[in-house]
Curated annotation (Swiss-Prot):
Gene that this polypeptide is encoded by: ggt
Keyword Protease: yes
The keyword Transferase is annotated on this UniProt entry: yes
Name this polypeptide is given: Glutathione hydrolase proenzyme
InterPro entries membership: GGT_bact (IPR051792), GGT_CS (IPR055262), GGT_lsub_C (IPR043138), GGT_peptidase (IPR000101), GGT_ssub (IPR043137), Ntn_hydrolases_N (IPR029055)
BP term (GO), one: proteolysis
Catalyzed reactions per annotation: an N-terminal (5-L-glutamyl)-[peptide] + an alpha-amino acid = 5-L-glutamyl amino acid + an N-terminal L-alpha-aminoacyl-[peptide]; glutathione + H2O = L-cysteinylglycine + L-glutamate; an S-substituted glutathione + H2O = an S-substituted L-cysteinylglycine + L-glutamate
Residue numbers binding L-glutamate: R113, T421, E423, E442, D445, S464, S465, G485, G486
Post-translational modification: Cleaved by autocatalysis into a large and small subunit.
Localization: Secreted
CC per GO annotation: extracellular region
Annotated active site: T403
Propeptide segment residues: 29-35
Subunit record text: This enzyme consists of two polypeptide chains, which are synthesized in precursor form from a single polypeptide.
Amino acid sequence: MKRTWNVCLTALLSVLLVAGSVPFHAEAKKPPKSYDEYKQVDVGKDGMVATAHALASEIGADVLKKGGNAIDAAVAIQFALNVTEPMMSGIGGGGFMMVYDGKTKDTTIIDSRERAPAGATPDMFLDENGKAIPFSERVTKGTAVGVPGTLKGLEEALDKWGTRSMKLLITLTIKLAEKGFPIDSVLADAISDYQEKLSRTAAKDVFLPNGEPLKEGDTLIQKDLAKTFKLIRSKGTDAFYKGKFAKTLSDTVQDFGGSMTEKDLENYDITIDEPIWGDYQGYQIATTPPPSSGGIFLLQMLKILDDFNLSQYDVRSWEKYQLLAETMHLSYADRASYAGDPEFVNVPLKGLLHPDYIKERQQLINLDQVNKKPKAGDPWKYQEGSANYKQVEQPKDKVEGQTTHFTVADRWGNVVSYTTTIEQLFGTGIMVPDYGVILNNELTDFDAIPGGANEVQPNKRPLSSMTPTILFKDDKPVLTVGSPGGATIISSVLQTILYHIEYGMGLKAAVEEPRIYTTSMSSYRYEDGVPKDVLSKLNGMGHRFGTSPVDIGNVQSISIDHENGTFKGVVISGSNDAAIGINLKRK
């Protein structure tokens, strides 16, 4: 079955990508019924794609095979993931795309993070008594929807680095949405788990036909989404941000209690940023600046841990997990106090990473003792300026979002590391009627209780944890890392880097080594594989790891071997993710 799909897909893309025209009559055959044929590790000499869905990886890989570059492939992949992983990301959301330009050697971030509409207010997540509305309620309301940025981000990426048009790259995904594809276990579980949320909106007709959730192996057809993609193909991004669609989207948000208007959509624009940089054991790390907290606290935790010589302890020892947990507590305390949109608040970026502040935080970590009251420090002592906000304690009921991450590298040296999201599974659950676009709940990433760095304000971007990252050695990109998972993203990227560099693990082993995640004394998670006796030891010291393991993150990664001229792509085993290497035929 896979062979038939590949032949058809390749033939169609040959016409599209080589001829450069769009044959609107072209038909894409149905994809395979099984996803277990795809590789979780692959090697290529001419490029690599690693994504969270095999069909998206196929589409990205074929773009590369037919002469498109990594940026072209990334755009095609995002459209494909909107269809195949509709619960994770799409044009109703936003994200952070990091691009290394193989020609100029520059590294750039396209920030397509959603923004609050003009009508948003700091107290919009409080009830009439001034108490925070429970997260489970605010996450499905129109007030949770941020102005989507993904489509504008894709447009900007193609304008800056692309060699193929959006019109061309969106075409194959239109067929995938129209003709459908077999639902995998991940999507089937998500539909089942979130059917109540979906049943409230136009999404019920897509995912709950006849009132019953679609199941694994069923064909998911999304004709309304295909119609929207056709509008974008013919009219560009204006078809989304202006006109009839924009009115329908904003009216839908208002129907669910939000304030978004057509003007909010028309006024939206992306931000182009430089990454923040850090050094770690001979590597240079490029990662995300605010409004994502990911980069700052990834670098801060690496700096704190660097002097502890972590690899002197076994990778599954209680000592290693103790040092990780204590470091996470300190960094996540800082995150809760000082991180926000730098267009609105002062973020002490230099102070948080200052060597003297790092030493100050290191001194709070004791190998044999749990710090039972981890608190934010005062990074403002180490840089000019001051906070224009307070430290405000927030409710503990927030559920971490999901998101998707993927990464692409090509034979011209271009590299993309891209994390993209609608936040929770299926976002708010709100679908734009007749257009098939699922809307994000990104504004619940703001603080519910105002006064802090991350309070709601009009046109402000909510705090993010997305951490698309590229590591360099001798000024050459050698590794990409990223993950979904809300605030767990930072810890997933951290541990992958630690296991690969500090412990010297192969990339596959580093990606799959069991992870922990803890932000405070009341929030603990761990993956299957962390030894039970180690958990008992840690809990005996005062930690509070529970009795049941859970999956943390879903890392996608590419390593680049410049000496041998090869790319290795790695995704999680036992998933429907796929790494596909590109090996072009030589004459």
